[in-house]
Swiss-Prot record:
<keyword id="KW-0934">Plastid</keyword>
<protein>
    <recommendedName>
        <fullName>Small ribosomal subunit protein uS2c</fullName>
    </recommendedName>
</protein>
<keyword id="KW-0150">Chloroplast</keyword>
<dbReference type="InterPro" id="IPR018130">
    <property type="entry name" value="Ribosomal_uS2_CS"/>
</dbReference>
<dbReference type="Pfam" id="PF00318">
    <property type="entry name" value="Ribosomal_S2"/>
</dbReference>
<keyword id="KW-0689">Ribosomal protein</keyword>
<dbReference type="GO" id="GO:0003735">
    <property type="term" value="F:structural constituent of ribosome"/>
</dbReference>
<dbReference type="GO" id="GO:0005763">
    <property type="term" value="C:mitochondrial small ribosomal subunit"/>
</dbReference>
<dbReference type="InterPro" id="IPR005706">
    <property type="entry name" value="Ribosomal_uS2_bac/mit/plastid"/>
</dbReference>
<dbReference type="InterPro" id="IPR023591">
    <property type="entry name" value="Ribosomal_uS2_flav_dom_sf"/>
</dbReference>
<dbReference type="GO" id="GO:0006412">
    <property type="term" value="P:translation"/>
</dbReference>
<comment type="similarity">
    <text>Belongs to the universal ribosomal protein uS2 family.</text>
</comment>
<dbReference type="InterPro" id="IPR001865">
    <property type="entry name" value="Ribosomal_uS2"/>
</dbReference>
<dbReference type="GO" id="GO:0009507">
    <property type="term" value="C:chloroplast"/>
</dbReference>
<keyword id="KW-0687">Ribonucleoprotein</keyword>
Length: 236
């Protein structure tokens, strides 16, 4: 896999607060190699290491996208949800940004059944068939459609398991991460100072609480995916 230049700038990362970790009492000792200092009771992440792993992740997603691979971005906490959806849509990736339904990947046949139901209901709504049903029946189906849109809207075009999963908050999305590990799906994960760096295939030490930090990391990864997609289209 060739190394590329992704314009990862330490000053830009500092401005986004990527280096701010959690309080020193709330940390995982396995993160010690990724921490450069303590300041006013919080750990400071070593941004040189962040840049290195972010660059590796960009190389990986570029290479995968240039071969037509499929991505899933997972980030369900409120402050990350909009950024996750925007980034995923921009890069034509699947995404989950509301709630991870247990077994979404490990019990794929059930997820697939739900997706078929979702597609059928969307078709019925578009054709106006829902409005021709008795009011009570229509109301029940519209509630179902709304529920499915909330939780499966970001994966409505997913036809199989993703090739790579990008996780925005390791602790928040631990169930999703465990499912990927069980299935052998490669993962890229943001890891704050309270996380375990050994769980994901590529762990990017970064502030997973600040919106600016999350956006910066997502923007770099999404740019690499888009570049990979362009390469794939040109070579097809």
């Amino acid at each position: 896999m060739a190394k590329r230049y992704w314009n990862i700038n330490l000053e830009e990362m500092m401005e986004a607060g990527v280096h701010f970790g959690h309080g020193t009492r709330k940390w995982n000792p396995r993160m010690a190699p990724y921490i450069s200092a303590k300041r006013k009771g919080i750990h400071i992440t070593n941004l040189t290491r962040t840049a290195r792993f972010l660059s590796e992740a960009c190389d990986l997603v570029f290479d995968a996208a240039s071969r037509g691979k499929q991505f899933l971005i997972v980030g369900t906490k409120n402050k990350a949800a909009d950024s996750v959806a925007r980034a995923a849509i921009r890069a034509r990736c699947h995404y989950v940004n509301k709630k991870w339904l247990g077994g979404m990947l490990t019990n794929w046949s059930t997820t697939e059944t739900r997706l078929h139901k979702f597609r059928d209901l969307r078709t019925e709504q578009k054709t106006g068939r829902l409005n021709r049903l008795p009011k009570r029946d229509a109301a029940v189906l519209k509630r179902q459609l709304s529920h499915l849109q909330t939780y499966l809207g970001g994966i409505k075009y997913m036809t199989g398991l993703p090739d790579i999963v990008i996780i925005i908050d390791q602790q928040e999305e631990y169930t999703a991460l465990r499912e990927c590990i069980t299935l052998g799906i490669p993962t890229i994960s943001l890891i704050d100072t309270n996380c375990d760096p050994d769980l994901a295939d590529i762990s990017i030490p970064a502030n997973d609480d600040a919106i600016a930090s999350i956006r910066l990391i997502l923007n770099k990864l999404v740019f690499a995916i888009c570049e990979g997609h362009s390469s794939y289209i040109q070579n097809s």
